Amino acid sequence: MMCRNNFALYSTRKPVASVECPSYFQQPEEDMAGIVIIGAGQGAGQAAASLRQQGYEGAVTILGDEAFPPYQRPPLSKQYLSGDLPLERVYVRAEKFYADKDIDLRTNTRVASLDVTAKTVTTESGEDIAYDKLMIATGSRPRKLSIEGSDLEGIHYLRTIADVDGIAEAMKTAKNLVIVGGGYIGLEVASVAATAGLTVSVLEMEDRILQRVTTPEMSAFYHQLHTGRGVNVMTKTGVSGFSGTSDGKVAQVLCGDTSIEADLVIVGIGIIPNIELAQEAGISCDNGIVVNDHCQTSNADVYAIGDCSNHPNPILGRRLRLESVPNAMEQARVACANMCGEDKVYAAVPWFWSDQYELKLQMVGFSSDGDTQVLRGDQDKNQFAMFYLKDGAIVAVDAVNSPREFMICKQLYGKQVDAEKLADPEVDLKTLL
């Protein structure tokens, strides 16, 4: 899974309820503790910038447990891993930006607890930091294997810059890479590694790769794409353990009665939202930190955005938790607007992307919402769009090397269309708007 991969979806299928957003706090500026942001991912970086763009002049503090300023995660499994993108270009903004905007960016700072009554954040070093408003942007962490040999050297997970630096270094000498998990993150890494000349195997326990996030037709397309580049894609294959060398390095991946040689393993089997701080503080959680349509939690002064939040989507008509950069960025803007006294609702059509080899896949909505598929373009030429309709209206698209179709679908989302015209490449999609 693009897990950020660029995205994954977890839905609780609960109806959207209307909620009230309380008015912004009113107190003298000299008495204001300011706004604290826990987490230093892309959403957190956007939030800090948005607060200054909103004209907020109080203290803004970002607390991040990594050694880096806010950065983009999507390139990690693609251009950064391949070496095509330098570290500085992974950063959301140059480090100088935060000082220039009087934003207190604290890296290597892990938060130990929250006290929503006292309105303080306590770091692992024991420092108490007061806040008027708090944003939780703690993201997620990789789900880990707990099986025989899973602690051997050479078994990696991909989530952070440090993770990718370790993988990139290992790839310099590795010959046989096994990727456990056939989601977007795993497939993106497979494309980088295969291009670099490694022998690559992808192991997926489900019937097909990408089973949780797309249709059988798209799974088959990407299966063929990877096998055509020499990747050994094995579905219906679960991992039972790992065996190692005498010095504790991984040597084989065990799959029941069979084994696969490996001197490097990357595991991508999903993520776990980082909600423990909120849970322990008594904030409502259910498959994420529960927020309303203003990105506000059950505590009036605490907001949550990104991977860790479970939000209502009025367009889809249900609650869901998204692992998606566009979602985190837009939620950051909405939450900050509301923190600053506006009344702004988060209502966006989800969209995602994945880069594999020379193909860019761009997605709008969820294919599982459709009851009809309409193909436009030529799959054999690696340039097509698969539209998904429900009761004649567009609810999703998977666009491969078809940016125009992707952009048009954003505008056509939810609208009734003529399926025959949609499928005809001679028909200008703008005529359907």
Language model feature labels by segment:
Residues 30-34, 53, 308-407:
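Mid-to-C-terminal Rossmann-like scaffold of FAD/NAD(P)H-dependent oxidoreductases
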Residues 167, 419-433:
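Cysteine/selenocysteine-centered motifs that mediate thiol-based redox chemistry or coordinate metal-sulfur cofactors
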Residues 138-196:
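Glycine-rich dinucleotide-binding loop and its adjacent helix/turn
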Residues 151-173, 244-334:
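FAD-site-proximal beta/loop scaffold in flavoenzymes
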Residues 31-104, 192-213, 408:
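Beta1-alpha1 glycine-rich phosphate/pyrophosphate-binding loop at the start
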